[in-house]
Design a protein with these regions (language model features):
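Selective transmembrane helix interface/packing segments
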Residues: 2-279
Length: 279
């Protein structure tokens, strides 16, 4: 029996093999998220992959859209200007001003807007035909975005405390007994320098990875049952799996927006902690 053919718009590594070949259907896994497009050294670290290409495309699209929409501003906005103003006002007012505070938020709006739009566009690419890959499902990309947030966070906190040493001292609340201070300092250090960055990056990565894997399972599994199933029940199950994947796609779109919003919201929360006098 011939192998099941997976659409070229899906990950090519996720292939259902022929019965009696390599064991039948192979469930999509984490390995399907590594696909060297231009492997300079085989499949090494310097290979240009689909996530890298999609990320560059997203940056180009965002730059083209924002520059084009704001080149000729009018009192009555065009559709593109309306979308730009809407996204800016959403991030500025809902995230920046409401979370960081009206005194300090404006200087951080460009960072927050960049984070929100970049993450959102790259997440939505997960359901765009012929791309269908959420780049945030590659853990290195959320980690880089998190590092940017935390460089800003700690830089602002150190400036507010007028130095590195006063900043570290501020991690310990006043009035504690001497024996408790090293313990609490260790816990606070882990929280601000390890746990918070890890959870911020891994939350985005995990949701995008799990959501895309789920869609792959339903679509590729449905295709296998529909084409390779040897009875009507399996064929019907395959068709049902395809239908369910359509509903899952709309649900995934909601998750993609929420993850972009949550990442940006948490970044604003951490920055607000840095600018706070009580930090």
């Amino acid at each position: 029996m011939s192998p099941t053919v997976v659409s070229a718009s899906w990950l090519p590594a996720a292939v259902a093999t022929a019965e009696g070949g390599e064991g039948g259907f192979q469930t999509p896994g984490v390995a399907d998220f590594w696909w060297p497009v231009i492997p300079f050294d085989g499949t090494g670290a310097w290979a240009i992959t689909r996530p890298a290409i999609v990320l560059l495309i997203s940056v180009g699209l965002l730059a083209w859209f924002y520059v084009g929409a704001t080149r000729k501003l009018t009192v009555v906005p065009s559709k593109s200007q309306f979308m730009v103003e809407g996204s800016y006002n959403f991030v500025r007012n809902t995230i920046g001003r409401d979370i960081i505070g009206s005194k300090d938020f404006l200087q951080f709006v460009p960072l927050l807007l960049t984070l929100f739009t970049l993450i959102l566009v790259n997440n939505v690419f997960g359901i765009v035909p012929f791309i269908q890959f959420p780049t945030m499902s590659r853990v290195g990309i959320p980690i880089v975005l998190t590092l940017i947030v935390y460089v800003v966070y700690h830089t602002v906190a150190i400036r507010r405390k007028h130095g590195v040493l006063p900043y570290f001292k501020s991690l310990i609340p006043p009035g504690l007994p001497g024996w408790l201070k090293p313990i609490l300092f260790g816990l606070e250090f882990l929280t601000y320098f390890v746990i918070r960055p890890l959870t911020l990056a891994l939350r985005l990565f995990g949701n995008m990875l799990a959501g895309h894997l789920m869609l792959l399972v339903f679509i590729i599994g449905g295709e296998y049952l529909l084409l390779e199933g040897d009875n009507l029940f399996l064929n019907f199950s395959g068709a049902l799996s395809f239908a369910f994947s359509i509903g899952m796609t709309f649900f995934e779109l909601l998750i993609e927006f929420l993850q972009a919003f949550i990442f940006t919201l948490l970044a604003a929360l951490y920055i607000s902690d840095a600018v706070s006098e009580h930090h």
